[in-house]
Design a protein with these regions (language model features):
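Catalytic-domain carbohydrate-binding cleft regions of carbohydrate-active enzymes
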Residues: 1-205
Length: 205
């Protein structure tokens, strides 16, 4: 049985990993320019920017692109998720740093782009503390999506209940680091029930 699959463009950006902060910017800016070009050419195209620090640095160096970014964001085609200032490592910082990271990112988005993030998409981060649902909901997120930290065997779409009882709609990215394309093969048909893909009717984005 064939099923429709909605996809969106995105790329994971490391603020600093194997290069310096400045060392990653040229390649990242090329990706953003390509995304803006696709948004202009294709009215159904959607692109997601993870971290506000990248959008801020991009517009500092290329302010002429701000109008386009604001326009596509208002149209709901340029999204920011999680829209924090940087992508956090939740195994290390405190709850205070989670909130401050969100606050700085959200304030910049509201001021410069005119949008507020609603999906807490934690791509390629380590750790999901049990208070995350509470923190995410208090920050104004409607849903949570993550990649690392799950081996499968359960539904990919579920309600995550935090320590205080707060619930948030949560989507595990089927395929994790290797992407969902791996699971759109005959292999997926054989393992669909095991990874919960067949029971996933929609994603949160």
């Amino acid at each position: 049985k064939r099923r429709p699959v909605d996809t969106f463009g995105a790329f994971h950006y490391d603020v600093a990993y194997q290069k310096t902060f400045e060392g990653y910017l040229p390649q990242s800016f090329d990706a953003l320019e390509a995304a803006l070009d696709l948004l202009r050419k294709h009215p159904d195209y959607i692109f997601v920017i993870e971290q506000v620090i990248l959008a801020r640095e991009f517009l500092r160096r290329r302010p002429r692109r701000k109008a386009a970014m604001r326009r596509y964001a208002r149209q709901g085609r340029l999204l920011f998720a999680p829209g924090m200032f940087t992508m956090p490592d939740l195994n290390l910082p405190s709850g205070e740093s989670f909130v401050r990271n969100f606050q700085i990112g959200r304030d910049w988005l509201l001021r410069e782009i005119g949008v507020e993030p609603k999906l807490c998409w934690m791509a390629d981060i380590f750790g999901h503390p049990p208070q995350t649902p509470q923190l995410a909901r208090l920050c104004g997120y409607d849903a949570y999506m993550f990649e690392r930290g799950r081996a499968g065997g359960e539904d990919a779409l579920f309600w995550w209940r935090g320590l205080d009882g707060t619930r948030i709609l949560t989507q595990w990215e089927v395929g994790t680091y290797y992407g969902i394309a791996l699971y759109l093969s005959d292999y997926a048909v054989q393992r669909g029930d095991e990874i919960g893909f067949r029971r996933t009717e929609r994603v949160v984005l």
